[in-house]
Amino acid sequence: MRFLVWVFFVGLVTFVSGTHAISKLANSNEPQSTQLTMKDIDTLTRLLFVEDGDAAKRFLRSNANQDLTTANDDSDVKEEERGLLPSKVTNLISKAKNGWAKWKANALEKAFQHMMKQGETPTSLAKRLEIGGAAELRYEKVYEKYTAWWINYHTVAGT
């Protein structure tokens, strides 16, 4: 079973790390590096060492000195995917996280209501879990959550 999980994890990492990039220079009519003269190379190196001014700005996706939020040049900046993971994968992950959080909140609500019906108070829960002594961290977290829920239930419900 561990081997199967390991194979799945390696496959997932391989899938996520695969990238495909296409250079815009390959399809453009700009001169290639073999066509540059010494004067062009000198100009380029001077531009690279300029610290201030407009020449220091880098436009990685186009050669236009336009606002990067506008997509009226041929680079279509707004439509480009820039994350490590595609947006479909991140949407699936966020849906799974939200579903898990909702399920967990419902389960805690039901458990706390059951505990209250059985007559459990924060004081009796603290005694039973030995809060203040050598209690485990998870017990302290349950106690804190139940106490907050119990106080909220009794103040909001008006009972």
From Swiss-Prot:
GO cellular component, one term: extracellular region
Keyword hit for rRNA-binding: no
Region listing for RABA-binding domain, in residue ranges: 109-159
Segments carrying motif RxLR-dEER: 58-82
Disulfide bonding pattern of the chain: none
Signal sequence residues: 1-18
Keyword Nucleus: no
Domain of life: Eukaryota
Keywords for this protein: Host cell membrane, Host membrane, Membrane, Secreted, Signal, Virulence
Localization of this protein: Secreted; Host cell membrane; Host endomembrane system
Subunit structure as annotated in this protein's UniProt entry: Interacts with potato RABA GTPases including RABA1a, RABA2a and RABA4a.
Function text: Effector protein that contributes to pathogen virulence. Targets members of the RABA GTPases subfamily to inhibit vesicular secretion, leading to an accumulation of secretory proteins in the endoplasmic reticulum.
Family the UniProt entry places it in: Belongs to the RxLR effector family.
Domain notes: The RxLR-dEER motif acts to carry the protein into the host cell cytoplasm through binding to cell surface phosphatidylinositol-3-phosphate. The C-terminal part (residues 105 to 155) is required for the binding to RABA GTPasesproteins, causes redirection of the truncated effector to the cytoplasm, and leads tio the loss of the ability to inhibit the host secretory pathway.
Annotated protein name in UniProt: RxLR effector protein 24
Organism, scientific name: Phytophthora infestans (strain T30-4)
Taxonomic path: Eukaryota, Sar, Stramenopiles, Oomycota, Peronosporales
